[in-house]
Design a protein with these regions (language model features):
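Basic, glycine/lysine-rich polyanion-binding surfaces/domains
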Residues: 1-193
Length: 193
């Protein structure tokens, strides 16, 4: 199953942003949900199935370099996708709370990302990764991620623009970046979500 936002606009140009500014952190522990609720202040009731996620922030601004997306895998396992600045602050916060909560994290230095946007982005991703379309997210703070083989594909609303972040090991991601370029997505130097 895959999702997109019902109220977000698509970029005019089909674009691919190769992105070294995102960090992926896998977060787990028997008290991972408690930490997200108590320390980060998140309401986890909307996370009803694996892949659902939400946008959060460490500084009160959902569009800053301290914002993040966190995806639910289970009560004890989550994935953060966030800018480098936010990842450093989040790692410090988790380290500070590890004595209080049964939590741990792994910075996935083996994973890289690119951002895809444009009118053809959703359909191209559904076709390329054999995803089943069907979910429409009305809340801009919700996001969704789906695993397809070695690739994790996410849907986020960034400043009222539908964007998709593709996450995989570098060699796999390079292959998919070439594929997306063959599908008409121009590589841009503009900062993405």
């Amino acid at each position: 199953m895959f999702a997109r936002h019902s109220n977000a606009n698509s970029a005019v140009i089909n674009a691919l942003q190769a992105d070294s500014s995102h960090v992926v952190i896998d977060f787990s522990g028997s008290e991972a949900s408690v930490f997200l609720s108590a320390i980060l202040g998140h309401d986890l009731t909307k996370l009803t199935a694996s892949g659902f996620g939400f946008k959060g922030t460490l500084d009160g601004d959902l569009n800053s370099d301290f914002s993040y997306a966190v995806y639910y895998f289970s009560e004890t396992a989550f994935r953060f996708v966030l800018p480098v600045n936010a990842s450093l602050q989040l790692q410090a916060l988790i380290n500070e709370q590890q004595l209080r909560y049964d939590i741990d994290f792994v910075v996935r230095t083996d994973l890289a990302t690119f951002t895809l946007k444009g009118d053809n982005a959703f359909d191209t991703l559904v076709e390329a990764f054999k995803l089943t379309p069907g979910l429409r997210l009305a809340d801009a703070q919700l996001c969704y991620g789906a695993q397809s083989g070695d690739v994790f594909v996410t849907a986020v609303d960034q400043n009222n623009e539908q964007q998709f972040i593709v996450i995989a090991k570098t060699s796999t991601l390079d292959k998919w970046q070439q594929y997306m370029q063959q599908q008409g997505f121009s590589v841009t130097n503009t900062q993405a979500a």
